[in-house]
Every structure is written in C-alpha cells, then in structure tokens.
Amino acid sequence: PEMSRGLGDVYKRQTMISTDIGIDLGTASILVYIKGKGVVLKEPSVVAFDRDTNKIKAIGEEARLMLGRTPGNIVAVRPLRQGVISDYTVTEKMLKYFIQKALGKKILKKPRISVCVPSGVTEVEKKAVEDATYQAGAREVAIIEEPIAAAIGAGIDISRPCGNMIVDIGGGTTDIAVISLGGTVVSTSIKIAGDDFDEAIIRYMRKKHNLLIGERTAEDIKIKIGSAYPSAEAVSMDIRGRNLVTGLPKTVTVTSTETEEALKEATAQIVEAIHSVLEKTPPELAADIADRGIVLTGGGSLLQGLEELIEEKTGINTMTAEDPMTAVAIGTGKFIEFLAGER
C-alpha cells in the first residue's frame, strides 16, 4: 500500500536506496562491481550440473575445479563461448547466483544492473542478456558494450568530443574501438585473445620440444615468461610435461624468446585488427589518437612486450590501464552513474 509521503517516508526512501551493480560477463570470468565497494566478486564463468536430474551442482570457482575431473553424470560447462551466450538457462542461473552472492541476502529493493557485452554481439544476444538479468532480479537493466566499459574503467572521460582508442584483450575476444562523445565510432571484435595465447604455447611446445602440456601449465608459462617483443635479457623456466616420444614425464627449459616465437601469429592478428580500425577512423579522431595514444585493458594486455609491439607497428604511443583485469567491471558499474547523470 502507498504510504502518505511524509518526512518519515522521505527518510525511509533514503535508507532504501537501491544498489547499483556492474557485471562484466566474460567468457573466462565474471566480475561484479558494487558502487561504493568496488569489485566484490571475481569467479570463473563455469557451471557444473548433473546430467540425469539437470540440477546445478556448483557455480564459479567450485565448478572450475571440476573441469575435466567429473564422473560421467556430472558435467562442467562454460555457458559463454567467445563472449556469446551458448546456453541461455545456465547463464541465467549463473547470473542469479553471482548477483545474490555479491549482494548477500539483505536486498530490500531490486538493484539497477548494467551488464557488459562484447561489441560484436547481435541484438538477439543483447536481448537474451537483458532478459536473463531481469530474471535474475534486476529492477532496471542497462546493456553496455565492452570497449565503452573498458574506457570508463581505464579512467578516460568518454563524454568529450575527443577520439580515444581502446584495445580490450579478454579471454575469448579482443575488442578494439575508437570512442568519442560517449559512443563507439569505429570498432571490431576478433576471436583472438588470452585463450589463444595459451593454445599457441601448447602447440609450440608439442612441435618444438615434443612435449605435451596442459592448459594450466600453458597459462603459467604465459604469465611468468610470456613475451610479445624481444627483450634485452631473456628469462627462462623449467616446464614439466609428457614426452610424446617416450610417453614419460620430462622437464624442459623454456625461454621468453621462445614464447615470443610461439605467440607471434596471435599477437600479429591483434596488431592487424588495430591497423584496420585505424584505417577506418575519421581523420580528426585519428589525429586525437596519435596525440593521446592507445590504451590497453583486459587480462590479455598483461602480456609482456605487447605495448612495445603495438607501438612499433603503429607508431602510436601505447599504454596499459592501471588495473587492466578489473577495468571493464569498474566501467560497467560507473556506466549506470554516467546514465543517471545524463537524465
């Protein structure tokens, strides 16, 4: 029942102000940002469920530990493939779970939620994300494209009439965009990103060293000694895997110079995509970018030497955002404030 709008009511409304939440719905992980608290949750986008009963067994980190280790009736899946919803019902349940987990149980008023999607998604896919978010308990939903979220999170003032180029390298996709006046002017999304770096290392180790390694090991190599550009001093690490000839465990020493060779093809494709976006950029905005530089975000941007490589191939100053992993989540959360400010 509608109460009379007295002072007490105004006070009550103040204390019941709803929460603003930003969700970075990534192929590899999901991050939840809450206004005033920052990023409160970061978990793998994995769901494990029982085939026979269709009941969900685990979500997030708990489910990731089950990947490749489950008995026949339990399957662990990643419902988002290359930034696209491949399984709608599972995604909806996953969203619900993470929203509740991030907020805790005390929700007086439904939250306003903004969700970030890769720039290449179709209207149908956007609608699916929107529906899933409403189903998960949102009062209002705003869908934001990844490059814009990344730009806000990287601290760029996107409302100005000035060209900024953002390159967001995630797990499944790399989004490249030129942004001005709060919108995307030119953009492209390629399905070459962090996951492909790992796969390239696996292929290289097999070809060059006859060594079979798993995804976790490949990611380890990428993080510790992965390189996109020749550096003055090469670093190395010992890798354990299975020798393909003898079938027995073996240790091989790998150097950063080798990882550069392994990753050449994938990094070249990212540079190529940056080129094609620059070629389509209107001259005034291109001049802004030459002046202000290219900003990298996303987990994939942490690859050593990537800035130097892009700089050498484009001739444009390139820098990585302060906290590239969480830039998209933070930007998604702040986007709601940006929208509210425009009303």
Located regions from the model:
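Nucleotide/phosphate-binding catalytic cleft detector across ATP-hydrolyzing
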Residues: 9-169, 177-295, 301-343
